[in-house]
Amino acid sequence: VQGMVYCDTCRSANALGFMR
């Protein structure tokens, strides 16, 4: 499962407040 990549993307999105 792409956990590392997902986490990295989620972190970026979280910074923008996209995924909250």
From Swiss-Prot:
Compartments reported by the entry: Secreted
Keywords per UniProt: Allergen, Secreted
PROSITE patterns xrefs: OLEEI
Top-level lineage group: Eukaryota
This protein's record includes keyword Disulfide bond: no
GO CC aspect terms: extracellular space
Keyword Secreted: yes
Family statement: Belongs to the Ole e I family.
Additional detail: On the 2D-gel the determined pI of this protein is: 5.3, its MW is: 17 kDa.
Protein name: Pollen allergen Beta v 1
